[in-house]
A protein has these predicted regions:
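Walker B catalytic acidic pair
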Residues: 144-145
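Conserved RecA-like ASCE P-loop NTPase motor core of nucleic-acid helicases/translocases
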Residues: 60-72
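ASCE P-loop NTPase helicase motor core
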Residues: 148-226
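Pre-P-loop entry segment of helicase/translocase ATPase cores
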Residues: 1-29
Length: 292
């Protein structure tokens, strides 16, 4: 005679209060920019594992995207696995099935699945367009290191979240989540999601200073960086928009102005044939002591 033992277990996780609005948001877009050590990716991983383990969200499936598919293994996949083991401890394998090839995670309670893809070329983008699930529907997408993606990549992903959810679990909703360090102030993500108000968008900001789990040594390290590398600290310490590395001209502002040569006191062209990038020609105007 075989006997089965019933396990009563309640998963537990610790969250940073700063991310409560993020985890409660039901709009279409959650856009999380933040400093290194802010805990944004850890929070998103735990939020997804908590929701996908909950019978209240039966039918929810998640697609996780990095620009390069292979980088998921040591980043998003590892982060989600870590969240499972934090929340379920020694019972993790009783509640979640882990598949290493291809990468996937499946909750044994709800049947909800997590799969991982990349969008580095047209072939991978086409694969994303044909994703289906045996149970439920693709309703959530997580783009980690989202600044690696082109706007066209995200548009393809966004198009995957469509169709009425009538007849399915009423708790389900479509949502794209992006997490990233805001490297460039000219990035398309800033223009699309941060520079104008949109009721479908939650644009969230966090830093290591709001992470209650950060250790004192890391905090001191970031304070040293503030003195030694102010621009790097702005991006990786404060989570502000900026530019890092490779810039020749760093002190400039972006404005609209007339490019007619007659509008300047002097005008010059310069050419850079480029070792790493394509040939470039730069027009420089001089007017009243200002360079354009």
């Amino acid at each position: 005679m075989t006997m089965a033992a019933k396990i009563e277990f309640k998963a537990s996780a610790q969250f940073n209060p700063v991310f409560r609005p993020v985890n409660e948001w039901r709009g279409r877009y959650r856009i999380l920019k933040g400093s290194a050590g802010s805990g944004k990716s850890v929070n998103i991983a735990q939020d997804y594992i908590a929701k996908m383990s909950d019978p209240a969200y039966i039918g929810a499936n998640l697609l996780v995207v990095r620009k390069i598919e292979e980088t998921n293994r040591d980043s998003t996949f590892a982060e989600l696995q870590a969240a499972i083991y934090r929340m379920f401890g020694p019972y993790a394998e009783r509640f979640w099935k882990v598949n290493l090839n291809p990468l996937s995670l499946e909750c044994k309670i709800t049947g909800n699945r997590i799969i991982f893809r990349g969008v580095k070329d047209q072939r991978q983008r086409e694969k994303v367009k044909s994703i289906t699930f045996k149970n439920g529907k693709l309703v959530w997408i997580w783009c980690e290191e989202a600044t690696e993606l082109l706007s066209e990549d995200v548009d393809i992903l966004d198009d995957r979240l469509r169709g009425k959810l009538d007849g399915m679990n009423p708790n389900l909703y479509y949502q794209i989540t992006m997490t990233f360090n805001p490297v460039s102030a000219t990035h398309w993500i800033k223009a699309r999601y941060f520079d104008k108000a949109d009721p479908d968008v939650l644009a969230h900001h966090s830093t290591y200073k709001t992470n209650r789990f950060i250790d004192p040594a890391y905090y001191r390290r970031m304070e040293r960086r503030k003195e030694e590398d102010p621009e790097g600290y702005r991006v990786y310490g404060l989570g502000e928009w900026g530019e890092l590395g490779g810039l020749i001209l760093t002190n400039f502002e972006v404005h609209d102005f007339k490019v007619n040569r007659d509008a300047f006191d002097a005008f010059y062209y310069g050419q850079d044939f480029g070792y790493n990038h394509a040939n470039a020609i730069l027009g420089v105007g001089w007017k009243d002591g200002e360079v354009y």
